[in-house]
Structure formats: structure tokens, C-alpha cells
Amino acid sequence: MNVAIEAMLYNNKNYASHHKTNELISTWKQHLSSWDKFNSVPRLFIKYEDMLDNTKKILLHIINFINSLTNLSIKKNNDFLENILNTTSFNYLQLLEKNIGFNEATNNSLFFRKGISNQWKTVLSQNQKDLMQNELEIPMKQLGYLV
């Protein structure tokens, strides 16, 4: 866990991807900041916690965002929405990963593990939490993770 936290906080490296090209892996703070400052492209910022709290409302928000940028005019009938909600639910994706795999998973653990919010508060040691909060205080407050 310490290695993952250090990578999230301090690493800014190029890694060879499975496509055999180098990919820049920036810190979490840099990643967030780059999207925040990228004003030339419309973007929609959604937190995982918000999706958990009101999935259907967030789905409608996503559809409205896509419709505002395209000529697709995605219909929002109940059957269509329920199909999206069912096939993108955490439990469904977790089942798919167990049955057929998932490219983003590591060899040692599943990608879709628990699907709960704020798990970092119970999983990380106090030292790890303090380190993250000290390094990421401003963005964590902006996102509502700290008060």
C-alpha cells in the first residue's frame, strides 16, 4: 500500500503500457489539476461517491452532457435507463470480472473489489492517512473529502 500511495503522491514517470508505448503516469494532484485547467474542451467531473449516492441522477446528468455536445439526442426512456443501470452496476461488473476477467486488474487482485466510498478512511494506517491529507489537503477539501 505504501508503494501505491507514494506513486500517487510523488511519481511522475513514463511506464511502458500493454500497447508497448510509454504512458505518463502523473501524480493524482497533477492529474486532477490538468483536467481542472483544461478549459478548451467541455468536461464533466463526476465523483464515484456521487454515482453511488444517486446513480440514476448522475446517469441523466451524463446523458444530458453528451446530448449538449452531440447530435445524438440520447433518449431517456425507462427501459433504456434501467438497462444502463443494470449493466454498469458494481455487482454486475464485479461478476463480469470474475467470469471473463478485466484488463485493468492486476495479477494479484481484482479491480472491482468492494465498491464502497471512503474506504481509504478504514483501510489506510493513520500514518498513511496523515501523509495523504498533508500532501493533498487542498484538492481533497475542494472535492469534499476533507472539511
Annotate each predicted stretch with a short phrase.
Residues 110, 114-124:
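Short His/Asp/Glu-rich catalytic/ion-coordination signatures at enzyme active sites or charged loops
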Residues 121, 133, 137-140:
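Generic N-terminal initiation segments characterized by hydrophobic and/or small/turn-forming residues
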Residues 139-147:
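C-terminal helix/juxtamembrane-tail motif
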Residues 1-111, 126, 130, 137-138:
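PAPS-dependent sulfotransferase catalytic domain
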